[in-house]
Regions:
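Hydrophobic transmembrane alpha-helices of multi-pass small-molecule transporters
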Residues: 68, 183-188, 213-217, 291-292, ...
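Transmembrane helical elements of multi-pass membrane transporters/channels
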Residues: 22-41, 145, 179, 208-212, ...
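N-terminal transmembrane alpha-helices
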Residues: 11-51, 64-79, 83, 108-115, ...
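Short runs within selected transmembrane alpha-helices of multi-pass transporters and secretion channels
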Residues: 146-164, 175-183, 201-216, 297-301, ...
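Small-residue-rich hydrophobic transmembrane alpha-helices
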Residues: 56-116, 153-172, 282-340, 344-346, ...
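Helix-terminus/linker motif at the lipid-water interface of multi-pass membrane proteins
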Residues: 32, 36-57, 126-133, 189-196, ...
Length: 469
């Protein structure tokens, strides 16, 4: 088995286009599978007889809570997988196994705590997140089951990250694809055949993750693997130092995911206030459609990161600029396809989620408005991840949070006063445009500094100048 941390020298020599495809395609498959995983539930739930419109609106109400659960997962998973990769690179397998064990224990502790607290106050939380008397029963039915299986979800995604970090990305991708395919098959059985409605969608989701978790657990309980979990329960003790390091490293991604939770909460509240239950359902549909294209671009970004980071560290700035430009081109093409789908065939895509005429009309108009600036969104995403790839974390976080908190949240509260729920939709392209302008300013500053350096110059020189900027 390949060891994570082994330096792939091809990153500095192989043709950039071939490298980007080599690294991006598996990530795109995994990201697309993740987005389809979320879409499948929405599509089937939206077609539940007689109550589909309110059911999909109830599902949309749960988005902030789901985002918060994801944020807690990244808090543990990102930090632990980062430390694990470093230890494997040092061939310190004993310490790596301790990190793996602590990742499991932290996920159990956080998963149980989140479920207990949330279940204790579920109805007030859902009402705060935008539920009404019409949508609360559906949101509650879905979340009760999801929360009961929350530990399974945390353990599965956490261990899947560890599989990837340990040098087996194909297995991690395969498990993701498996959950999507099995969920697609099981959803209609539980929702329609067994007539369980939105509860059936939640049960199918948890069962699919349980099956994937069982396989992943078997992988890590194999004592012949250099990375494995202990069999004796006496060995399951939390190491405070490892836990602290993992949570510290994961704090950045946690904050960014938490920002998404806050933004979704505000959107739901404003949609309910100015447009009613169906407006929230329309946002849920638009969110799922847009998310599909965004996740493809995330795959390109994941492919770019190791290439840009390696060549930056090696002082090969020409290759750094080349991979950035190629990734921007690819992401822009994807974003333009998303724009065409949104502007010229919204009815076709929205019809996948609902047959309700009123909900379809709201989602059609919302999709057109929300994605007006979509052709440039790919560029902004690449810029954010480019700074992260070069170790300029503060600029990356600034670009990510500015779009959501600095630009989008004020617009969500300001524009509906004048334009009703249409103002919420209008907030997206305006915030995207503002974020694109900020990204361009930061990138121009960076590339001006690149021009002063030749390939082979010490990257620390560039880094020190950037810190002073």
């Amino acid at each position: 088995m390949a060891i994570a941390g082994t330096v792939p020298t091809e990153l500095g020599d192989k043709r950039i286009r071939d490298l980007l495809m080599q690294y991006a395609v598996p990530a795109i498959i995994a990201m697309t599978a993740s987005s389809l995983y979320n879409m499948v539930d929405s599509i089937y739930i939206g077609h539940i007889k007689d109550v589909g419109s309110y059911a999909i609106s109830g599902l949309a109400v749960t988005f902030p809570l789901m985002n918060l659960a994801t944020a807690l997962g990244t808090l543990v998973g990102v930090g632990a997988s980062t430390i694990l990769s470093m230890l494997l690179g040092q061939r310190n397998y004993k310490a790596a196994n301790k990190v793996l064990l602590n990742e499991v224990l932290l996920n159990i502790i956080i998963g149980v705590a989140f479920s207990v607290v949330t279940l204790s106050f579920l109805d007030p939380i859902l009402m705060f997140f935008g539920a009404s008397q019409n949508t609360l029963p559906f949101a509650r039915d879905y979340m009760v089951i999801i929360l009961l299986g929350n530990v399974i979800t945390h353990l599965y995604f956490g261990l899947n990250n560890m599989v990837r970090a340990s040098g087996n990305p194909k297995l991690a991708m395969g498990l993701t694809v498996f959950t999507v395919v099995s969920n697609t098959i099981m959803d209609p059985i539980f929702i329609f055949v067994l007539d369980m409605g939105i509860k059936g969608a939640a049960i199918a989701t948890v069962l699919c993750q349980l099956m994937a978790l069982i396989y992943t657990a078997r992988y890590f309980f194999n004592q012949n693997n250099y990375l494995h979990l202990p069999k004796s329960l006496r060995d399951y003790k939390l190491d405070i130092r490892i836990a602290k390091d993992s949570l510290t490293i994961g704090m950045g991604p946690f904050l960014m995911n938490s920002a998404a939770c806050i933004v979704t909460l505000f959107i739901n509240q404003q949609m309910l206030k100015y447009g009613g239950d169906l407006a929230i359902g329309a946002y849920g549909i638009v969110n799922r459609i847009s998310f599909f294209f965004i996740m493809i671009n995330m795959g390109f970004n994941q492919g770019m990161q190791p290439i840009a980071g390696y060549n930056f560290g090696a002082g090969k700035y020409t290759r750094v600029k080349r991979v950035f430009k190629l990734t921007v081109i690819c992401a822009t093409i994807v974003s333009c396809v998303g724009f065409i789908v949104s502007e010229f065939m919204p009815d076709l895509t929205v019809s996948l989620f609902t047959n309700d005429p009123e909900l379809k009309e709201l989602a059609d108009k919302g999709l057109r408005l929300a994605n007006l600036a979509f052709p440039l969104v790919g560029f902004q995403m690449v810029a954010t991840n480019f700074f992260q790839s070069l170790g300029m974390v503060h600029k990356s976080i600034l670009l990510s949070l500015s779009r959501q908190l600095l630009f989008l949240v004020p617009l969500i509260y300001f524009l509906p006063v004048f334009f009703g729920h249409r103002g919420v939709w209008m907030s997206f392209p305006i915030a995207d445009t503002a974020a694109i302008v900020l990204s361009t300013i930061l990138l121009l500053s960076l590339f001006r500094k690149f021009r002063k350096l030749n390939d082979g110059d010490d990257p620390a020189i560039l880094g020190s100048k950037i810190k002073q900027a």
